[in-house]
Amino acid sequence: MTPRRYNPDRRRDALLERINLDITDAVAQSLREDLGGEVDANNDISAQLLPQDARSHAVVITREDGVFCGKRWVEEVFIQLAGDDVNFTWHVADGDAVKANQPLFELEGPSRILLTGERTALNFVQTLSGVASEVRRYVDLLAGTKTQLLDTRKTLPGLRTALKYAVLCGGGANHRLGLSDAFLIKENHIIASGSVRQAVEKAFW
């Protein structure tokens, strides 16, 4: 096996290839957590108090300056709950810098569905935008240097690709997506191998 030299473009491309399936899975899991173990909007008993044919219009506004991330997760939440019955109007794109009190997006659809999906959608937006915003802060501090900001595998379970995508939106770069991407010899590998030399030689041969 030939060791792979770090290539941020290859990491980014690999992430973008995986992300569609991971978005679907992550959203489904989050909705199941709210809806009694299955993706069924009828399990939101509070939303069922509203008239079935009622429709609403909602505007999501940011509370503070930052970097937006999470568009496709928001859309997937409502697609899984209501197919194409929710309409989106987007005022920002992933990676855009936003100001406090700026409208991010608007939703129009069944009132029950908007209320059922609201918290799940916002959880994704807040988490991913928070990561993107913090990454951008450090990237800006490093501007003018040759230093590149990389992420790690220390991510929330089930959200690996989402959080690494947020890093890209903030201007950072991805390191390893998983253990199969590249060798990374750390203290425990050295201890188990017997020496740094043995670990490195094994990686090359």
For the regions a language model picked out, list residue spans one by one.
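Acidic/glycine-rich phosphate/pyrophosphate-binding loops and surrounding catalytic core
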Residues: 2-205
